[in-house]
Curated annotation (Swiss-Prot):
Organism: Xenopus laevis
Stated name of the protein: Proximal tubules-expressed gene protein
GO biological process: one example: retinoic acid receptor signaling pathway
Record membrane topology: Single-pass membrane protein
Transmembrane stretches, start-end: 33-53
């Protein structure tokens, strides 16, 4: 039975024998300008595929967000009303709504719900 060393020796010598053969058709299959044109077309097609995939991904994530027009924020027993705009996905509050009832120079931190955050395992 052949050992592993004999098999590797035969494979290496066969590779050397095949590489020494004369190739009659040594010219290029395509001219250089056509090779560049094909490469550019493939690149632009891949960019288009990535762009369309990103557009569908963003559309799907925007449809999955369910926010109310008005959210109620409760902090330290006080109730504050903030309007949420759906198109820009941010909550706008007046400064008087954020003032703390405990101290005149202190402000409350409202809870902001953001379902659009994507996280991945590292």
């Amino acid at each position: 039975m052949f050992s592993l060393q004999h098999v590797l020796l035969i494979l290496i010598s066969l590779g050397q024998v095949y590489s020494q053969q004369v190739h009659h058709n040594a010219g290029r299959k395509f001219p250089q300008w056509l090779t560049g044109l094909i490469a550019m077309t493939v690149f632009l097609f891949l960019v288009l595929v990535v762009y369309v995939a990103k557009m569908f991904w963003d559309k799907r994530s925007q449809e999955s967000i369910n926010m109310k027009d008005i959210e109620e924020v409760v902090a330290n027993g006080t109730s504050e009303c903030c309007e949420a705009r759906k198109e820009n996905q941010y909550i706008s509050c007046n400064m008087k709504d954020l003032r703390s009832s405990e101290h005149i120079h202190a402000y409350e931190n409202p809870i902001e719900v953001n379902d659009n955050v994507r996280s991945t395992a590292m």
